[in-house]
Amino acid sequence: MLAPEHRLRSSALFSTVVKKGARKGSRTLVVHLWTPEPGPDAPLELTGGPRAGLIVSKAVGNAVVRHAVSRKLRAVLATIIDEDATAASPQLQETSFVVVRALPGSAEASSKELESDVRRCLSRLSR
C-alpha cells in the first residue's frame, strides 16, 4: 500500500504534474514526472519523500477492472518508493511528483508487466 506521506491528493497538483512534468509512455500506461526546483513558487508538499498519484479513467474498463488496475499500480509505486529509499542512486528524488495514467491496455496486463512498464518509463525519464 502506498504510504499516506507518499500520496498525491490535490487536484491542482495533479494538473501541475501532468502539464509541467516530462512524460514517457508504454502500451499500458503513461508516467508523468515533475521535480520542481525549491523556491517561492514550489509546492508546499516538498518534504516527506516522493509523491505519487494515479489516473485510471473509464476507458480502462468498468469499476471492478479500474479498481484492480489501481491496486496493482499502487503496489508497484509503493515498491519503487520503498526501494528508492534505500538505494544508492534512486530513480525518484525526495522532491519528485509522479502521476501514472493507466491506458486501456493495462486492464489485461499482469502486475509484473505493469511494474516493468513503470520502471522502464521512470528510468527513461530520469536520464
UniProtKB/Swiss-Prot annotation:
Pfam entry (one): Ribonuclease_P
InterPro entries per the UniProt record, alphabetical: Ribosomal_Su5_D2-typ_SF (IPR020568), Ribsml_uS5_D2-typ_fold_subgr (IPR014721), RNase_P (IPR000100)
GO MF annotation, one: ribonuclease P activity
Signal peptide: none
Function of the molecule: RNaseP catalyzes the removal of the 5'-leader sequence from pre-tRNA to produce the mature 5'-terminus. It can also cleave other RNA substrates such as 4.5S RNA. The protein component plays an auxiliary but essential role in vivo by binding to the 5'-leader sequence and broadening the substrate specificity of the ribozyme.
NCBIfam families: rnpA
Self-association state and partner proteins as the record states: Consists of a catalytic RNA component (M1 or rnpB) and a protein subunit.
Name of the molecule in the record: Ribonuclease P protein component
